[in-house]
Amino acid sequence: MTEIKGLGGMLNGFRDLVKDAESITFVGTPGFCTPFAEFLAFPIRDKKLAFVPNLKIEKTRKMVATEYGMELGDATSPDADVVVILGGMAMPKIGVSIEEMADLLGKIEHKKLIGVCFMGILEQAGWCGTPALGFDYVMNTTLMGDISGE
């Protein structure tokens, strides 16, 4: 197990996990997961990147670097060296089952599967350690903070 600290540690840790990959596809919920996929994609923007919204493989879009940062672009294939499942997919209110995710993964050619989540949601949802998904790595980050003021 490798400990990561802060956002920089998260980015560096993720970049290390995918350093040998030429292409990475993120699977996540629109809105909630999209900015995290863009955040993780920025330091690896020289690779072929894609985003699958929810389980809608037909809506896969390229992730492209622009003067504004990472943005979704034209339609593309979801096939990649690495597929990254973002934790929002495992949140109860999203309603994606392990079986549905496994079915989606069966439609995407990939060599490695990585889970990226906050606050242990992939483990809480029972997605870690299940043969149906078979994560090669899971990156979990715990967020803590405070608000000060009046």
What name fits each language-model region?
Residues 1-3, 27, 58-62, 90, ...:
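Short linear motifs at secondary-structure transitions and domain/linker junctions
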Residues 36-93:
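Long, charge-dense
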Residues 78, 82, 86-150:
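Glycine-rich, aromatic-bearing surface loops/beta-hairpins
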